Structure formats: structure tokens, C-alpha cells
């Protein structure tokens, strides 16, 4: 029986999946996971940085929720560490935080196209997030300070995902797998939004009777099976750990 991946392996796989699927270019993006001791595991940048697509478990290091981080020699924490710290501080229900730069999400928001529930069975989790509303943090800044991280956490509020205008997204979850899959779903919805906007009129949101027919397939399907399929795709492409 295959053992479950360790936290560092999960974060490394998540980074590889996000880069492989086009949500993270070169070195831009990171994932954190809350530790039992209150600190967090975080994808750091190393002395031989090769980008998110080739993230190794050795690129992941513990970082305190407060105070000065002290990664091993040659490693440094991302400039946007405050994103992770402030969301995890504000949201005790969140275990994992993803920050990436999905191009279709950024483009749709800049074009004034809100992510509405226009798809149904095509991607039910994306529809649910859009139905509840995906908030937007309106500043296109590098989130390098605690006060900016707090602004992002306030914009996110109790939602699973938020758009950072002209920048990217934050996606949260009760696991690395859930946060990564949510990020992928939002990018998929943004891609469909942009493509459908090329028609003569924007598609309407789903009618209530259709929404009522769409079940919650549960985390075993929405998160675990989808995650496993992306891990298998990495392995097939020779990019597995």
C-alpha cells in the first residue's frame, strides 16, 4: 500500500501541477501548509532555483507564523510571505494557501468580466465558487508587508478563493490538494468566461432549476481524484517526484 505523501512532497507536487497546467510561470508562485505547531511549511527559493515546475521537497521549509524566518543557508522565503501568514492567521479553518498568477483569471478580471456561474456539470466546484461570489482585491501590488497581507485576507473574507487584480489569485483549502484543485477550477472558469465573451452576448448565469440538480460530489471526487489525475499526468510527462 502506498503511503500518503509527506507535507513537503505535497507542496512540491502542488507547485509542479500548477506550473504544468499553466497557472505559474517560471519562479512566480508558492504554496503554504499549516503545521501542527502553528508554524507553516512554505515553498522557498533555493540556491539552485529551477522554477515551480521542478520544485523539490527540499525547497520546502518551516517558517514561523510570527517573527523572522530563518530558512537554511542559500534559501530565502518568498517576498509575499505576508499573504500566507495573514490568511492563515485570519482563517483558522484554512490549512493550505496557494498563490499563483493564472493568466486567464487575470485577463478576465482586467477585461471587466466577473466570474459568474455560467457552467454547470462542466465544473461543479467552479460553479459553486462563482455562485457564492469570488471576491477581488483591487490593488495590483506585491504583497510584501503585513498590512497588505491583512488587506488580502480581508478581501478574501470567508471565501475559498480571491482574485488579486492585475496580479493573480489566492486559493485556500483544508489541504494542499483542495487548494490546488480550487485554483485550477477558477482558472478553468476564467478560460470559459473569456472564450464565451467572444460571442454576440455574454452567457447568462445558470437558472436556479439547473443549479438545484447539481450535486456536491464530495472531497473524495472533487479533490482527491482530480489531484491524483494531475499527479499521474506529471508522472506520464516525466515530471513526477
Regions found by a protein language model. Name each.
Residues 1-241:
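Glycine-rich flexible loops
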